[in-house]
Amino acid sequence: KFMNALMDNREQMLNPTAFIQSTFNTVGAQLALLLKIHAYNVTYVHRGLSFESALIDGIMSIAEGKQHVLAGAMDEITPTSHIIQQRLGLMKGTTAGEGAQFFLLSAQKEEQTFAELKGVDTFITRMSVPEISNRMHHFLKSHRLAPEDIDWFISGKNGQKATDSVYTELEHSLFPHALHSSFKEQCGEYQTASSYALWMAAKALKEEASSRYAL
Protein backbone atom coordinates (compact mmCIF):
# COMPACT_ATOMS: atom_id res chain seq x y z
CA LYS A 1 0.00 0.00 0.00
CA PHE A 2 2.75 2.45 0.95
CA MET A 3 4.83 1.69 -2.15
CA ASN A 4 1.80 2.07 -4.44
CA ALA A 5 1.01 5.43 -2.84
CA LEU A 6 4.66 6.41 -3.26
CA MET A 7 4.41 5.85 -7.01
CA ASP A 8 0.93 7.35 -7.42
CA ASN A 9 1.87 10.56 -5.61
CA ARG A 10 5.29 10.85 -7.25
CA GLU A 11 7.00 10.71 -3.86
CA GLN A 12 5.12 13.74 -2.54
CA MET A 13 2.47 14.30 0.16
CA LEU A 14 2.72 10.79 1.55
CA ASN A 15 1.03 9.62 4.73
CA PRO A 16 3.63 7.50 6.58
CA THR A 17 1.05 5.62 8.66
CA ALA A 18 0.94 2.61 6.32
CA PHE A 19 4.74 2.32 6.47
CA ILE A 20 4.92 2.80 10.24
CA GLN A 21 2.25 0.15 10.78
CA SER A 22 3.66 -2.29 8.23
CA THR A 23 4.10 -5.90 9.28
CA PHE A 24 7.84 -5.80 9.85
CA ASN A 25 7.68 -2.65 11.98
CA THR A 26 4.84 -3.78 14.23
CA VAL A 27 5.53 -7.44 15.03
CA GLY A 28 8.13 -6.70 17.71
CA ALA A 29 5.98 -3.99 19.25
CA GLN A 30 2.84 -6.13 19.21
CA LEU A 31 4.65 -9.03 20.87
CA ALA A 32 5.98 -6.71 23.56
CA LEU A 33 2.47 -5.37 24.22
CA LEU A 34 0.88 -8.82 24.34
CA LEU A 35 3.59 -10.29 26.59
CA LYS A 36 3.97 -7.08 28.63
CA ILE A 37 7.67 -6.83 27.91
CA HIS A 38 9.00 -3.38 28.85
CA ALA A 39 12.59 -3.99 27.81
CA TYR A 40 14.95 -3.23 24.94
CA ASN A 41 13.10 -3.88 21.68
CA VAL A 42 14.56 -3.55 18.19
CA THR A 43 13.62 -4.75 14.71
CA TYR A 44 16.22 -5.48 12.02
CA VAL A 45 15.15 -5.27 8.37
CA HIS A 46 18.43 -6.25 6.69
CA ARG A 47 17.14 -8.62 4.03
CA GLY A 48 19.10 -11.88 4.24
CA LEU A 49 20.98 -10.73 7.35
CA SER A 50 17.93 -9.70 9.39
CA PHE A 51 17.72 -12.78 11.61
CA GLU A 52 21.48 -13.04 12.03
CA SER A 53 21.61 -9.37 13.08
CA ALA A 54 18.91 -9.97 15.70
CA LEU A 55 20.70 -13.09 16.91
CA ILE A 56 24.06 -11.32 17.23
CA ASP A 57 22.33 -8.46 19.06
CA GLY A 58 20.83 -11.01 21.44
CA ILE A 59 24.20 -12.68 22.04
CA MET A 60 25.77 -9.28 22.74
CA SER A 61 22.97 -8.45 25.19
CA ILE A 62 23.63 -11.72 27.04
CA ALA A 63 27.35 -10.87 27.14
CA GLU A 64 26.49 -7.46 28.63
CA GLY A 65 24.64 -9.06 31.53
CA LYS A 66 21.09 -9.72 30.34
CA GLN A 67 19.71 -13.06 31.57
CA HIS A 68 17.05 -13.75 28.94
CA VAL A 69 16.59 -12.49 25.39
CA LEU A 70 13.78 -13.31 22.96
CA ALA A 71 15.13 -13.32 19.39
CA GLY A 72 13.32 -14.35 16.25
CA ALA A 73 12.30 -13.63 12.70
CA MET A 74 9.26 -13.68 10.47
CA ASP A 75 8.48 -13.32 6.78
CA GLU A 76 5.31 -13.62 4.78
CA ILE A 77 4.55 -13.92 1.08
CA THR A 78 2.60 -11.04 -0.43
CA PRO A 79 1.38 -11.04 -4.04
CA THR A 80 3.25 -7.83 -4.89
CA SER A 81 6.62 -8.87 -3.45
CA HIS A 82 6.34 -12.33 -5.01
CA ILE A 83 5.69 -10.88 -8.48
CA ILE A 84 8.60 -8.45 -8.13
CA GLN A 85 11.00 -11.22 -7.09
CA GLN A 86 9.85 -13.38 -9.99
CA ARG A 87 10.42 -10.54 -12.47
CA LEU A 88 13.92 -10.00 -11.09
CA GLY A 89 14.66 -13.70 -11.48
CA LEU A 90 15.26 -14.16 -7.77
CA MET A 91 12.85 -17.07 -7.45
CA LYS A 92 13.93 -18.97 -10.56
CA GLY A 93 14.14 -22.67 -9.74
CA THR A 94 13.15 -22.11 -6.11
CA THR A 95 10.00 -22.46 -4.05
CA ALA A 96 8.83 -19.34 -2.23
CA GLY A 97 8.25 -19.76 1.48
CA GLU A 98 7.31 -17.91 4.63
CA GLY A 99 7.57 -18.54 8.34
CA ALA A 100 8.15 -17.32 11.88
CA GLN A 101 10.58 -18.74 14.42
CA PHE A 102 11.50 -17.38 17.87
CA PHE A 103 14.12 -18.47 20.39
CA LEU A 104 14.63 -17.75 24.06
CA LEU A 105 18.32 -17.15 24.72
CA SER A 106 19.53 -17.59 28.31
CA ALA A 107 22.77 -16.66 30.02
CA GLN A 108 22.82 -19.94 31.94
CA LYS A 109 21.76 -23.50 31.16
CA GLU A 110 18.27 -24.08 32.51
CA GLU A 111 15.91 -27.02 32.89
CA GLN A 112 14.24 -26.31 29.53
CA THR A 113 17.55 -25.79 27.68
CA PHE A 114 18.18 -28.35 24.94
CA ALA A 115 20.82 -26.71 22.72
CA GLU A 116 23.73 -24.30 23.02
CA LEU A 117 24.43 -21.65 20.40
CA LYS A 118 28.22 -21.63 20.08
CA GLY A 119 28.52 -18.73 17.66
CA VAL A 120 27.30 -16.82 14.61
CA ASP A 121 29.34 -15.56 11.66
CA THR A 122 28.17 -13.60 8.61
CA PHE A 123 29.78 -12.24 5.46
CA ILE A 124 28.25 -10.51 2.45
CA THR A 125 31.18 -10.15 0.06
CA ARG A 126 31.53 -12.58 -2.84
CA MET A 127 34.04 -15.30 -2.04
CA SER A 128 35.45 -18.29 -3.84
CA VAL A 129 34.85 -21.76 -2.41
CA PRO A 130 38.42 -21.95 -0.99
CA GLU A 131 37.90 -18.56 0.70
CA ILE A 132 34.60 -19.70 2.20
CA SER A 133 36.26 -22.92 3.33
CA ASN A 134 39.06 -20.99 5.05
CA ARG A 135 36.55 -18.76 6.77
CA MET A 136 34.62 -21.77 8.03
CA HIS A 137 37.86 -23.33 9.30
CA HIS A 138 38.64 -20.12 11.20
CA PHE A 139 35.10 -19.96 12.61
CA LEU A 140 35.25 -23.53 13.88
CA LYS A 141 38.76 -23.04 15.28
CA SER A 142 37.61 -19.95 17.20
CA HIS A 143 35.21 -22.27 19.04
CA ARG A 144 37.79 -25.03 19.52
CA LEU A 145 36.22 -27.24 16.89
CA ALA A 146 37.36 -28.86 13.64
CA PRO A 147 35.37 -29.92 10.54
CA GLU A 148 35.46 -33.56 11.66
CA ASP A 149 33.63 -32.58 14.89
CA ILE A 150 30.52 -31.58 12.94
CA ASP A 151 27.86 -34.29 12.98
CA TRP A 152 25.32 -32.49 10.83
CA PHE A 153 25.86 -29.94 8.05
CA ILE A 154 22.69 -28.02 7.16
CA SER A 155 22.92 -26.07 3.90
CA GLY A 156 20.76 -23.47 2.20
CA LYS A 157 20.38 -25.28 -1.11
CA ASN A 158 17.32 -23.89 -2.87
CA GLY A 159 17.37 -25.34 -6.38
CA GLN A 160 19.62 -22.73 -7.99
CA LYS A 161 22.60 -24.55 -9.52
CA ALA A 162 25.04 -21.65 -9.13
CA THR A 163 24.73 -21.51 -5.33
CA ASP A 164 23.87 -25.15 -4.72
CA SER A 165 27.18 -26.21 -6.26
CA VAL A 166 29.03 -24.21 -3.58
CA TYR A 167 27.26 -26.10 -0.80
CA THR A 168 27.91 -29.42 -2.54
CA GLU A 169 31.63 -28.70 -2.79
CA LEU A 170 31.79 -27.75 0.89
CA GLU A 171 29.95 -30.95 1.81
CA HIS A 172 32.52 -33.04 -0.03
CA SER A 173 35.64 -31.12 0.97
CA LEU A 174 34.93 -30.17 4.60
CA PHE A 175 32.22 -32.47 5.92
CA PRO A 176 32.30 -35.80 4.02
CA HIS A 177 31.65 -37.68 7.28
CA ALA A 178 28.67 -35.56 8.42
CA LEU A 179 24.97 -35.91 7.74
CA HIS A 180 23.92 -33.48 4.98
CA SER A 181 20.51 -31.88 4.62
CA SER A 182 18.90 -28.77 3.12
CA PHE A 183 16.39 -26.91 5.27
CA LYS A 184 14.83 -24.97 2.37
CA GLU A 185 13.33 -28.19 1.06
CA GLN A 186 10.96 -27.91 4.01
CA CYS A 187 10.38 -24.18 4.46
CA GLY A 188 11.03 -22.72 1.02
CA GLU A 189 13.04 -19.61 0.19
CA TYR A 190 12.59 -16.36 2.11
CA GLN A 191 14.87 -13.70 3.56
CA THR A 192 14.92 -15.05 7.12
CA ALA A 193 14.79 -18.76 6.27
CA SER A 194 17.96 -19.31 8.31
CA SER A 195 15.81 -18.97 11.44
CA TYR A 196 14.04 -22.15 10.34
CA ALA A 197 17.44 -23.83 9.98
CA LEU A 198 18.33 -22.93 13.56
CA TRP A 199 15.01 -24.30 14.82
CA MET A 200 15.52 -27.45 12.75
CA ALA A 201 19.01 -27.97 14.19
CA ALA A 202 17.98 -27.30 17.79
CA LYS A 203 15.01 -29.67 17.53
CA ALA A 204 17.19 -32.44 16.06
CA LEU A 205 19.88 -32.02 18.73
CA LYS A 206 17.17 -32.37 21.36
CA GLU A 207 15.76 -35.55 19.83
CA GLU A 208 18.96 -37.19 18.56
CA ALA A 209 21.34 -37.97 21.40
CA SER A 210 24.00 -39.18 18.95
CA SER A 211 24.40 -35.72 17.37
CA ARG A 212 26.51 -33.17 19.24
CA TYR A 213 27.37 -30.42 16.77
CA ALA A 214 25.41 -28.97 13.85
CA LEU A 215 26.58 -26.25 11.47
Name every feature range the model reports, one short phrase each.
Residues 2-6, 81-92, 170-171:
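Short, surface-exposed, charged loop/turn segments at secondary-structure junctions
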Residues 82-152, 177, 215:
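Condensing-enzyme catalytic core mediating Claisen C-C bond formation in acyl metabolism
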Residues 2-56, 111-112, 165-197:
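Conserved catalytic cysteine-centered active-site region
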